[in-house]
Amino acid sequence: MISPLPTPCEWVDGKAGVSIPLDDRGLNYADGAFETMSCSSGEIACQSLHSDRLSLALEALRFPHPEAIAQRVFDDICRCVASVGHSGTARLTVTRGSGPRGYAPPDSASPRHILTLFPLSGQTPDRQSCGIAQIRWAHQPQLAGLKLLARTEQVLAAREAATQQWDDMLMLDAQDHVISTSRGNIFVFFGNQCVTPDLSQCGIAGTRRQLLIETVLPQLNYVVDEQPLTLAVLRQADAVLISNTVRGVVSMSRIEDQHYPESAFPRRIQDALRQQVASWVGG
């Protein structure tokens, strides 16, 4: 059952009922970054992880004083989320603000932030099917790992999934390395060994991915390695899991004609991640 939304549920620079100007550079040039976050009873989970990643994205985009901007923005959105006691998800978008025509950002730009709240969705399936997307991740190491507004590859991959009736699409780079799905990060299991793709050239380094690598999987006695990954390796795996903020952890039932048996251990990882996220609520 989908929970009702609070009122207000949208803010621009901390103010409800404000429109976004047509000269906003996020709208015109995707000049900005965003974060998707989970909230519980008016508090944002993994707040510091999201704030740190936002700061890195703003630094890569050459925003002035990125850490200060991220801190100010999170102070503001935490107030908004708390004011309505929201439980569900939230999207934070930070743009460079308004500016004249042309790619070059103005020196006088004033960053703008938009917060949108979404209700708790109904229960999602524990397992999902994946096709293999035709669209490939482009290498751009200067922007790798960051959640920037320009998400063209994932938009096209998601369109492929809908057209071909897959739950999600596996996304590779031009060198045929597996990077992610259109919705999340990938973890491949061989016994107690876990491999997750190296994201130094492209992809998004998710906050749930970070928790899994640094805390959850080691606590469950898995050895985690970040390295290039191929489809051939995936086909030999015991299990493949996908992580993101909204769904937590979901296991793959199949990748095209490759089927993976149902197992209890993805549920243990899901439960452990959920407990870890709960401990980060408000922090």
Where are the model-predicted features located?
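Helix-start/capping segments and mature chain N-termini
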Residues: 1-79, 95, 100, 104-283
